[in-house]
């Protein structure tokens, strides 16, 4: 199963567990706290007035021994069920003041005070926490503004302090919106509509038994602004592309990117094609490495190779796997002065197809970094940069008999071609992101469950303490035990 669906299923399961836990807690809180055997005996029929009289009869004064209210209520219910409720004539002839108190208690019984935690559960507690946080923030902001106003009044006088206070209020109201707008604008403008193209032109091609060389010139532009113009040799070091990583685990990644830039920008790519296709007769070579963003702001890469009138193009789309799309070179723009035959075309296509997957993955990984780095170079006014030096680019000690394929590139391509151990594939990076998201989801679920348990304990701490005290008293009181066994 895809990691995307696994994480989605885990998130849905976590939300469902949270919802049903909340419903179960709410249902348990709304149930009667009395045991079933006592709830069936009409214990809840006692009014607040009769319970008050029973408390007074048993010597419990209002306002004291608040912890024993539940135990007294239980004793009152037991006495009422046993028929031992006796109200003397003296208690019925109370003075006017006591009757008024009884009426007030009856009114309170009709409209009892409901704790928000008991009425709404976790939602009420969350609402109270939000209100408390808002009050604390308003209080903190008020104190900060008052201290700032006093400081401005002390230094600048009353008129200037008034204007400064107005500015602070406006800044406090609009600062967050302005910050969010700037961040969104920066995110939208970064890399959107950027195009970087590096074209090379190779002449005086010389293919011998032990070396392949040519005169090569490279020209790089960023949004039609020139950032490099000079020989192909050494272009990677002269362009501060900064493709290294500090992490030791990404050392191979740095090596591949650096070597890939040299391979495509310094003319080694057409030299490999010419060396392995010795039968074709080529006098000059044109090529291009292009990275750009399309209308939907998706990064795309393109490799172009032109051999005497025949062009070959490889296109790569970021955030896609080479195994999910067709990776192949296409022959386009065949000019009228094409001198190569069909056999030569088949030979070139066979050579290009061998490492098409490696070139595709490299474009996917290189183009986003190349675009960002080129934008920085353009902002640093690195324009019309012209370099001088030798134009000769060669592959020394290179023969088809000594090694099959380009030795350096094939050595590094083995890691890319293997689906399980690929380091630079976009899908592997996506799996890494989903793994991090899975860890964060599990951590968030654990924190949520822990917070739910803590909130439950906080809301029920008083009831738990009363239950523990009642259990302790019940174990130490034999009379209460006898009454309970007698009712059962």
UniProtKB/Swiss-Prot annotation:
It holds the Pfam family Herpes_UL37_2. The record marks 193-194 as: Cleavage site. Glycans are attached at residues 206, 210, 219, 223, 242, 275, 281, 294, 297, 306, 333, 337, 343, 384, 391. GO terms for cellular component: host cell endoplasmic reticulum membrane; host cell Golgi membrane; host cell mitochondrial membrane; host cell peroxisome; membrane. InterPro entries: Herpes_UL37_HHV-5-rel (IPR010880). Residues 83-107 have a biased composition (Acidic residues). The chain crosses the membrane at residues 439-459. Residues 83-119 are annotated as: Disordered. Residues 1-22 form the signal peptide. One of its GO terms (biological process) is symbiont-mediated perturbation of host apoptosis. Keywords: Glycoprotein, Host endoplasmic reticulum, Host Golgi apparatus, Host membrane, Host mitochondrion, Host-virus interaction, Membrane, Modulation of host cell apoptosis by virus, Signal, Transmembrane, Transmembrane helix. Belongs to the immediate early glycoprotein family. This is UL37 immediate early glycoprotein. It comes from Human cytomegalovirus (strain Merlin).
């Amino acid at each position: 199963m895809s990691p995307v669906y696994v994480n989605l299923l885990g998130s849905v399961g976590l939300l469902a567990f949270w919802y049903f836990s909340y419903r179960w807690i709410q249902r348990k809180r709304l149930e009667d706290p009395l045991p079933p055997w006592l709830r069936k005996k009409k214990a809840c029929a006692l009014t607040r007035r009769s319970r008050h009289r029973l408390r007074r009869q048993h010597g419990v004064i209002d306002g004291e021994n608040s912890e024993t209210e539940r135990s007294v209520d239980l004793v009152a219910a037991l006495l009422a069920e046993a028929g031992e409720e006796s109200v003397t004539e003296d208690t019925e002839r109370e003075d006017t003041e006591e009757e008024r108190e009884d009426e007030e208690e009856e009114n309170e019984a009709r409209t009892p005070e409901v704790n928000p935690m008991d009425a709404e559960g976790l939602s009420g507690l969350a609402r109270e926490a939000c209100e408390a946080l808002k009050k604390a923030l308003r209080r903190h902001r008020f104190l900060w503004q008052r201290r700032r106003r006093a400081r401005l009044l002390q230094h600048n006088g009353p008129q200037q302090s008034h204007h400064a206070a107005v500015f602070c209020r406006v800044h406090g109201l609009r600062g967050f919106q302005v910050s969010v707008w700037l961040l969104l604008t920066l995110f939208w403008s970064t890399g959107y509509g950027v195009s970087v193209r590096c074209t090379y032109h190779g002449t005086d091609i010389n293919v011998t038994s032990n070396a392949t060389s040519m005169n090569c010139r490279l020209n790089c532009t960023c949004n039609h602004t020139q950032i490099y113009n000079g020989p192909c040799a050494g272009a990677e070091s002269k362009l501060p592309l900064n493709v290294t990583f500090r992490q030791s685990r990404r050392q191979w990644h740095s090596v591949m990117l650096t070597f890939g830039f040299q391979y495509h920008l310094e003319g080694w790519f057409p030299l490999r094609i010419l060396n392995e296709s010795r039968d074709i007769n080529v006098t000059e070579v044109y090529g291009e490495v292009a990275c750009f963003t399309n209308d939907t702001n998706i990064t795309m890469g393109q490799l172009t190779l032109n051999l005497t009138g025949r062009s070959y193009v490889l296109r790569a789309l970021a955030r896609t796997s080479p195994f999910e799309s067709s990776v192949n070179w296409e022959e386009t723009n065949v000019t009228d002065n094409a001198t190569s035959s069909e056999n030569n075309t088949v030979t070139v296509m066979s050579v290009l197809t061998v490492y098409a997957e490696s070139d595709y993955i490299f474009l996917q990984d290189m183009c986003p970094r190349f675009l960002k780095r080129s934008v920085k170079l353009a902002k640093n006014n690195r324009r019309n940069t012209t370099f001088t030096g030798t134009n000769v680019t060669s592959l020394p000690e290179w023969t088809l008999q000594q090694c099959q394929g380009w030795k350096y590139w094939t050595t590094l391509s083995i890691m890319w071609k293997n689906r399980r151990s690929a380091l630079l594939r976009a899908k592997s990076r996506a799996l890494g992101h989903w793994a991090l998201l899975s860890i964060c989801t599990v951590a968030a679920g654990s924190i949520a469950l822990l917070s739910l348990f803590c909130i439950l304990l906080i809301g029920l701490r008083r009831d738990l303490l009363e239950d523990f005290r009642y259990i302790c008293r019940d174990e130490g009181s034999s009379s209460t035990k006898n009454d309970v066994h007698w009712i059962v």
